[in-house]
Amino acid sequence: MFSLPGYEYFLGFLIIAAAVPILALVTNLIVSPKGRTGERKLTYESGMEPIGGAWIQFNIRYYMFALVFVIFDVETVFLYPWAVAFNRLGLLAFIEALIFITILVIALAYAWRKGALEWS
């Protein structure tokens, strides 16, 4: 078998990291009560009895705002590494990032014009 000097601590950490959740799950199975009766069958909703059904329909406006948020959040995830390495990448990477930002600005203008960002 091959030897990896210096990785003993890492291997120990991996063993502990795997053992702790397994130990917690096994302890839960052993210690927890088995039957579900009375209060345990009720749905918990902020300490009160639940009112209404669980399948309510949200207004589509929430989905539109969430979609726009996710788009610009992903844009940030893509642009952050580019901004960190900006000095080393050169002009071509700058032009590519500019095209990427332009496409997203056009998409934002389109959503704005279609009224996707208006609440009323």
Swiss-Prot record:
Family note: Belongs to the complex I subunit 3 family.
Known role: NDH-1 shuttles electrons from an unknown electron donor, via FMN and iron-sulfur (Fe-S) centers, to quinones in the respiratory and/or the photosynthetic chain. The immediate electron acceptor for the enzyme in this species is believed to be plastoquinone. Couples the redox reaction to proton translocation, and thus conserves the redox energy in a proton gradient. Cyanobacterial NDH-1 also plays a role in inorganic carbon-concentration.
Protein name: NAD(P)H-quinone oxidoreductase subunit 3
Organism field: Prochlorococcus marinus subsp. pastoris (strain CCMP1986 / NIES-2087 / MED4)
Catalytic activity, reaction form: a plastoquinone + NADH + (n+1) H(+)(in) = a plastoquinol + NAD(+) + n H(+)(out); a plastoquinone + NADPH + (n+1) H(+)(in) = a plastoquinol + NADP(+) + n H(+)(out)
Annotated transmembrane regions: 10-30, 64-84, 89-109
MF term (GO), any: quinone binding
GO cellular component: NADH dehydrogenase complex; plasma membrane-derived thylakoid membrane
Gene name as annotated: ndhC
Signal peptide extent: none
Topology class, membrane: Multi-pass membrane protein
Assigned keywords, A-Z: Membrane, NAD, NADP, Plastoquinone, Quinone, Thylakoid, Translocase, Transmembrane, Transmembrane helix, Transport
HAMAP family according to UniProt: NDH1_NuoA (MF_01394)
